[in-house]
Structures are given as structure tokens and as C-alpha cells.
Regions:
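Feature captures the catalytic ectodomains and active-site-proximal regions of enzymes
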Residues: 1-395
């Protein structure tokens, strides 16, 4: 066993093995149903056998709702009762990365959207993909003359499905640049609350033509960040989602697939990145997220950075050379696109258990305020549920 794998096991990290059931192959299995030509492997075949062939398919992505939450529900929970398996998400386990894998059916090594923070080497800009803005100034990238197609290099497959496609987003993100990348405006719909969702699905299921609907739920992730994964407010919201699912199950000829982009883990210690020491070594801000970060180190500073970082943060983070993680297929199955690889830095750090890295000069904005987080390799972050409900059967 090589040194990288030893380090992972010693820290109870999940070693991503995409030969096992994973979210990318789940999406490939779903999109195959609608005449999308994509890679077929044993995982895709397994998923295809699990998915009922109903007229309507509702895919629900509940942000932050990892298997760790589902497993704690009562045994009579509709979500827990219908969980078919645990599957792995992609690494880094962060929303922008996973949502892009979801709509492109590609691993991060292909689409290159690495996390909440990205760095584009060609454009020489630190930016937030989901917000489509400059990380430092929050200026919309459109104001710089940067078009979405320059950032999102893989096309969303939702625009090509041979069926009636609907995408349901919360109203506050319904009209964002990223939402427009996901699906054209004609197929995109907003909701204010769960009643809007229930009414939309009921009406849609009355149509004679088949359909695919993608519903994105954001609440669990937000509440976990603010309160921790075991908080009452998270449990209460899960109960609301349970009730939503029960109402949706009143529609017949409907398949419901429920999963997450990632889970979260509780945070007990904040780690502050020493920008004062490292800023002169950086040629770009650290990217990805607050659990996993990528570092862009000027030539000639690599050894100094590595030695200092390992000494300063040895109890809180593990530093890897990016090339080592690439060679061990942490970001996919070994089909790295050069543009995706170029937008990673020379080093990547991963936080140890219950640690949270503030890799941002604005320390006061974050210090002590984050109770749950993700983007790392713990079980809680990487393992997500595969829940499948056939509303024609007893549930």
C-alpha cells in the first residue's frame, strides 16, 4: 500500500474508488433512459436495474443530506425505508463540484469546477462558480467580459434529454448564471415553499407525456453549516422533507430518486491560514473550499511552503502534492482534461476530523460561526444515500 493510501486510512478518510457505485454513474444511468449516449459500465447497469420504469421521474438533490443523516432517522421513516444503498459522491465533496458532475455526468477531472472557489489559469482570476463572480471584489464575471461558456466547459446534458424536462430551483437562485447553465429558461421553474413543489409535481404527473424533473433542495446544508449536523433545527427540517416526500408519493406512475451532493461533519476547531506568511508565495488565492484547499505556489517557494505548512498545521491538516492525488485517481477514473488539471494548484490540503480552514483574509466573517462543513474525505462527507421510491407500489 502506498504512502498516500496509508495516510488516508490512518485519518479515517474515504479513499475514493469510482469502481464502486457513485453519483456520476447514477446520473449516466438516468440520462440513458432519455437517449443520452454515455459510458456504460457495471455501475450504470446496476443503477438501471434499480430504477422503476414509470412515466415520470423526479430526481431530488437535497444539499448536505448525507447517509449519516438518513441512517439516524426512525426505522419507519419513508426515506430510510426506501434507501437502496450507500454510494459515494465525487471529491472534492463540495456543492459546485458535485452539482456540475450531476448535470454533465462527468467527474471533476473532466469538468474542472473544483469547489466554491475556483482559479482559472487562462483568465488569471479567482472566482466563485455558483455566484459567477470575482472572489475578491464580488464583481459579476460578465462585467469583465467573461462568458459562462469560458468557465463551464462541459455542457449540461439536461438540455438534450429526449423528454419533457423540468428543473425546480428555489426562487433566490432560479435566475442565476449557473442555473441558466444547468437548463434553459423555458424548462426552469422557481418555488417559494414546499407547497409550490407539491402543486407543481401534481400538475406535471397529470400530463400524458413522460417527464424528467430535477428538484434542488438547499435547506439542510445551510442549517448544518449554521447549527451542526445533530441540531434540532436540522432534524426538524428533515421531518418537513419527509412530509414533502409523503405528499409527492400521492402521485402515481412516478419514480422518486432522492440523494445528496455530499454530507457534512461537525466542526469543533477553526484553523486560520496564515496569509501574512504565505501571501508572497501565492500566485493565486487558495481554491476549492474550507475543508479541502488547493494552493498555487510560485516557482522557487515550493520547498519553503511545504516545510512551513507541515510544521504549522501538522495537527490539523494533511498536505499533499496535487500530482499524488491525481495519480491515485481521487478526482475521477484517470481521464484528466488538461484544462481541469491546469486550474488546480501545486498542493492540496485536507482538514482532519472536525477541523475547518479559514483560507480567507476576512477571518472575522467566519471565525466561530461554522458548526458543520464538508469538501473533505470523511465518511460523513463522502457517503450519500440512494433512495428510490416507486409510487405505484406500497411505500
Amino acid at each position: 500500500m502506498n504512502k498516500i493510501m496509508n495516510t488516508m486510512l490512518k485519518n479515517n478518510f474515504i479513499i475514493p474508488n469510482y469502481n464502486n457505485l457513485n453519483i456520476v454513474d447514477l446520473m449516466r444511468a438516468i440520462y440513458c433512459k432519455y437517449n443520452i449516449k454515455t459510458e456504460i459500465n457495471k455501475n450504470v447497469e446496476t443503477f438501471k436495474k434499480l430504477i422503476p420504469n414509470n412515466k415520470h421521474l423526479l430526481f431530488i438533490l437535497s444539499d448536505g443530506t448525507g447517509s449519516n443523516l438518513i441512517n439516524k432517522l426512525n426505522d419507519d421513516s419513508i426515506l430510510k425505508r426506501n434507501k437502496k444503498d450507500d454510494i459515494i459522491t465525487v471529491f472534492p465533496s463540495t456543492t459546485a463540484c458535485v452539482l456540475t458532475s450531476l448535470v454533465t455526468a462527468e467527474f471533476p477531472e473532466v469538468h474542472g469546477i473544483w469547489g466554491w472557489f475556483n482559479y482559472d489559469r487562462n483568465l488569471n482570476i479567482n472566482y466563485c462558480p455558483l455566484l459567477f463572480c470575482d472572489r475578491k471584489t464580488e464583481t459579476n464575471l460578465l462585467d469583465y467580459g467573461i462568458e459562462p461558456k469560458q468557465v463551464f466547459l462541459q455542457h449540461s446534458l439536461l438540455n438534450n434529454l429526449k423528454t419533457n424536462v423540468n428543473v425546480l430551483f428555489p426562487k433566490y437562485i432560479y435566475d442565476s448564471v449557473y442555473s441558466n447553465f444547468v437548463i434553459n429558461k423555458e424548462s426552469r421553474h422557481s418555488y417559494n415553499d414546499f407547497n409550490d413543489i407539491v402543486n407543481f409535481i401534481k400538475k406535471n404527473c397529470q400530463n400524458e407525456s413522460e417527464s424528467y424533473t430535477y428538484l434542488y433542495l438547499t435547506d439542510i446544508d445551510t442549517l448544518e453549516h449554521e447549527n451542526g449536523i445533530d441540531s434540532k433545527i436540522v432534524k426538524d427540517k428533515l421531518e418537513e422533507i419527509e412530509n414533502l416526500i409523503k405528499k409527492l408519493c400521492e402521485n402515481k406512475d412516478l419514480t422518486i430518486i432522492f440523494t445528496a451532493d455530499h454530507g457534512q461533519t461537525n466542526i469543533t476547531k477553526d484553523i486560520i491560514l496564515d496569509f501574512e506568511e504565505y501571501d508572497n508565495m501565492f500566485y493565486a488565492y487558495p481554491s476549492i473550499d474550507y475543508g479541502t484547499a488547493s494552493y498555487y505556489i510560485k516557482k522557487g517557494y515550493e520547498e519553503t511552503f511545504e516545510k512551513s505548512f507541515k510544521k504549522k498545521y501538522e495537527n490539523d491538516m494533511i498536505l499533499f502534492k496535487t500530482e499524488d492525488l491525481i495519480n491515485n485517481n481521487f478526482f475521477g477514473i484517470g481521464n484528466f482534461k488538461s484544462i481541469a488539471k491546469d486550474n488546480l494548484g501545486e498542493y492540496i490540503s485536507i482538514c482532519k476530523k472536525e477541523r475547518y480552514l479559514i483560507n480567507n483574509p476576512n477571518i472575522e466573517k467566519y471565525y466561530g460561526k461554522i458548526k458543520g462543513n464538508h469538501s473533505g474525505l470523511s465518511y460523513d462527507e463522502m457517503i450519500i444515500p440512494l433512495i428510490i421510491i416507486d409510487t405505484n407500489n406500497d411505500i
